[in-house]
Amino acid sequence: METWQEVTVHVHRDAQEAVSHVLIETGSQGVAIADSADYIGQKDRFGELYPDVEQSDMIAIIAYYPSSTNLADVIATINEQLAELASFGLQVGQVTVDSQELAEEDWADNWKKYYEPARITHDLTIVPSWTDYDASAGEKVIKLDPGMAFGTGTHPTTKMSLFALEQILRGGETVIDVGTGSGVLSIASSLLGAKTIYAYDLDDVAVRVAQENIDLNQGTDNIHVAAGDLLKGVSQEADVIVANILADILVLLTDDAYRLIKKEGYLILSGIISEKLDMVLEAAFSAGFFLETHMVQGEWNALVFKKTDDISGVIGG
């Protein structure tokens, strides 16, 4: 029977996406996130028992490697990469790395135990697809099976993107989701009343996973998923464009976004660490956008821009 090697990295919450990327790049077959914030404030609504945890800024990122992997080399590389991330200004915290062997059947499902239903915004709750959940009145439930290589929607960058969509969408809009990943932002847009959603990702795996997640949610036939390199070659106009990806990539799409967004439409950009904030602001302002909202959670920033001639209450341009 084949065995797998489980590596757990304890880092600051702000480093979640960057460290997850490091683990995937070193050969992990997927990652899971254990975050105390997912449990804080949870109520035993229908007999569920949630762990008794204290709020902490540290999270555990669990990665799974084939038994043939030279774990000593992998751990050395992980530590080198984390030190480099810290030198760039990303808050990684006091890093510790643990490892253990895991049987095949345990590996297949072990990562799922770290995911619980999570209320993300006033209206939106993300629920793992394998969990039974009874929604309260008015609650909009996003069923998600992210797979081990995609986030579960609880990262600050995703939360802020979802909050922005909830504030902006009123029904009937056309939305473009750039770098859709698990598809969570597209599904949320549909649940919040958008008429048509176009979801693009350069990664073929993401395109497949996004479509699978969309199929888990009823009433999402208005979401169209396709492979795409940012907004290159896109001609469809939109009321809202949302992108939750790395800041260095965000700056490459602002001109195309301005071309595609209708007047009085919105551009939501998330995934921006603080040291990259000015770079993203400059790119959006140069494209012609005005800043309407700036959200911050820890080291992460999300920005809501508007394409408008009415500059009262907005900044930049």
UniProtKB/Swiss-Prot annotation:
SUPFAM superfamilies: S-adenosyl-L-methionine-dependent methyltransferases. Its main location: cytoplasm. The keyword Phosphoprotein does not apply. S-adenosyl-L-methionine binds at residues 158, 179, 201, 244. It is found in: Cytoplasm. Methylates ribosomal protein L11. Belongs to the methyltransferase superfamily. PrmA family. HAMAP family: Methyltr_PrmA. This is Ribosomal protein L11 methyltransferase.
